[in-house]
A protein has these predicted regions:
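Short active-site neighborhood of thiol/selenol oxidoreductases, capturing the structured segment around
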Residues: 6-20
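Conserved acidic residues
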Residues: 50-52
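Extracellular/periplasmic catalytic domains that process cell-envelope and extracellular macromolecules
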Residues: 5-6, 38-41, 61-65
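Typically the conserved alpha-helix immediately C-terminal to a functionally engaged Cys/Sec
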Residues: 1-2, 22-41
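Loop/turn elements at helix/coil->beta-strand transitions in domains of secreted/extracellular proteins
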Residues: 7-11, 42-47, 74-78, 92
Length: 108
């Protein structure tokens, strides 16, 4: 996780699994969206974690359903978890809210 924290960016973790149909839909529809791809590459340190391969991290972050997205600040402190499928527009709004620290001024 330390490697993800480099650069002062928000850390974006997608907890996923090969058997998860909503994870596959998100990968196919959301993560291929040009605006999502651009925003992630410019503002986030992104990783995908297969819960079957690294169950200890899923337990650490209390992942009970898939997909679950976790956002951490640049120091690695947890900010929030977002469970469930998100389409491109919804994910963009959430990423912008978190990476700009708008949460410090009000609720989403």
């Amino acid at each position: 996780m330390r490697a993800l924290q480099a650069g002062g960016r928000t850390v974006f973790i997608d907890f996923t699994a090969d058997w998860c149909k909503w994870c596959k839909k998100m990968k196919r529809e959301t993560y291929t969206d040009p605006d999502v791809m651009r925003y992630m590459s410019e503002n986030m340190s992104v990783t995908m974690i297969d819960t079957e391969e690294v169950p200890s991290l899923a337990r650490k972050y209390n992942v009970n359903s898939l997909p679950t997205l976790w956002f951490l600040d640049a120091d690695g402190s947890p900010l929030t978890a977002v469970p469930g499928y998100l389409g491109p527009e919804k994910l963009l709004r959430i990423m912008e809210f978190i990476s700009t620290k708008a949460y410090e001024e009000g609720d989403y």
